[in-house]
Amino acid sequence: MKKLKIILGLSLIIILIFNLNYKSKYNDSATYIEGIIDKYKFDGSKLSLEVLGKERIVCNYYFDTIEEKESFKKKIKYGQTIYLEGKINIPNENTNFKLFNYRKYLLSKKIYYVFNIEKIEIKNNINLLYKIKNHLVKKLDKFNSPYLYAFILGDTNYIEEDIKESFQNNGISHLLAISGMHITFLFNGLYNLLNKIKKRKTNIIIVTILLFIYLFLVGFSTSSIRAGTMFIILKIKKIKPYKLLLTIFFLFLIYNPYLIFSQSFLLSFVVTFYLIIFKDLIKGNYFKKTLMTSLIAFIAGTPIIIYNYNSINLLSILLNLLFVPLISYIIFPLSFLSLLFNLKKTYTFFINIFEYIFNFIIYSNTAYMAPIKLAKNICKFYILLFDIIPVAYKII
């Protein structure tokens, strides 16, 4: 057993070193890209694509006319095979005043180049999973609700930038993402429902297949993979959740060391770890449990948020206390039910309530942000104190 652990440890170190020294399959002189459209976004006169070719790559195309843009909107779909000619570039480091490092962001997604498209050709040989996703998008289009894309597919491209910025500034941007909480809520409900019909082993197989399909539909985000993997493994085998979480964390970093630059990746794991090790504090009635969950998540995420933005919203605990139940237990389930049944009016009613409360609280409060300007070294100390030490303490 000891030898096996040593062999496993050495193997992981070798894989990590290999990934750190990984060289892109494209080169600086590439003028042709062929692959599958995995993601796309229309942004003004620009079409931004994530294409799965030799490896994942971002490709940008600029429209000459409004008519050309509208034509592409009608014909572009997920899963189409695309043939591109143009020029390849290394992504820029920083692109805005907040010093958002675009290159590191792309590296965290294992993207090494950006391709500027000059000529584009599309073919419609789409596989089954992408056909399902395109069918979902077509149904969502009928609702004309930008939030529905976020709640069902984790796609926030349809939500206006100022609204997304308000969510981020107020510490509730996770409500627009397919978080671990949503995955657990959705598939735990499905698992419990199947338990009344099928045997346990059959249930796990069915849920695993459906979970994989859903993870594909939402783009295999790190938080959804983390939550989905933990959900299935904990159903199959009794294992300490924090050990499983740390194992998944390190496996992610071995697969892609640049994930350490991803704020969403760090927040997902750190907040989940805190909720696990302090689960004994989350007791009592519904209000107390929700309050403690928000407080623990706030304490866990604060060092990372301050390090990235040099500011923190002190009201985010109360905002989460208000909006998490509304989104997670009413609007999120309604989003799925609306696709199956004629519940558009009910869904719209609760979305209107949410928007009214959100706008009233956010825009009537001129001092909702409490900026904390701190040096990077102090932020590192906070991360050490509040995030790293608890992890080390639990392991020891």
Where are these regions (language model features)?
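Alpha-helix C-terminal capping segments
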Residues: Y26-N27, V51-L52, F115, L136-K142, ...
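Membrane-interface helix/helix-cap signal primarily in integral membrane proteins
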Residues: G9-H174
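Juxtamembrane membrane-water interface segments that cap and precede transmembrane helices
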Residues: Y130, E160-N170, Y309-L319, N359-K376
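C-terminal regulatory/interaction regions
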Residues: K2-I7, I14-N27, D38-K39, D43-S45, ...
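Hydrophobic alpha-helical transmembrane segments in multi-pass membrane proteins
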Residues: L4-L10, F115, K164-I317, N377-I396
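Membrane-interacting alpha-helical segments
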Residues: L129, K133, V137-D141, L319, ...
